[in-house]
Amino acid sequence: YADGMLWGAKVKGDGLGDEVRVGGSTYNHGMKAGRIITDASGNVLGSDDPANNHVWRVRTDWATADLAVDAANYYGVAVSDVTPAQVAVVKGQYEYDWMNWPAAWGAPYNDVDGNGSYNSATDIPGYPGADQTMWTVANDVPLIVNEAGDSTGFLSTAPNLYGSDPIGIELQ
C-alpha cells in the first residue's frame, strides 16, 4: 500500500502545545474507525468506539440484484465458486447497511421528500444518482466515549504515523 491521504496543521489552544502536527494514512495509519462526538455547543467530547463502525455499502438494487459478483469479490473466489450462503451473507449486509444508513453522521443520501433531513421511509441512502455508494468515517481523537460523552476507552493512533499528537480531525 503506497498511497494514502496526509494532512498537516499548526494546532493551537488544546493544551498539547502549538506545533505542526501531521496525520493520515500511508504504510502506517494515524486514524481509527468512528466519528467524533461533540456536545450541543460543538465541543469535542471524544470519539465513537471503533467496534461500532465499518464500511457501509449500499446499492439501489440490493434486494433484487444477482449478488454473485459482489460475493465473489467479498470472499475472494471465482464467481463460479460462490455459494448461495455467501450470496445471502452479502445480501444481509446490504440490507443492514440500507436499513441503518448513518445519515445522521454525515453519510450522503438522496433527500427524496425534500425536507432537509434523512427519513428512512422515503429518502434513498447513498450518493444521489449513484448505483452504489461506500461510506466510512474515521478520526484521530484518542478518547473513546459513549453517546452521553462518558469515557469508555482510549486508543491513540496518531503517534503511529510520524510520531505526531492528534489534530482532532474526522475524515468521511
Question: What are these model-derived regions, one by one?
Answer:
Residues 1-172:
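A long-range scaffold signal marking pre-active-site subdomains of enzyme folds
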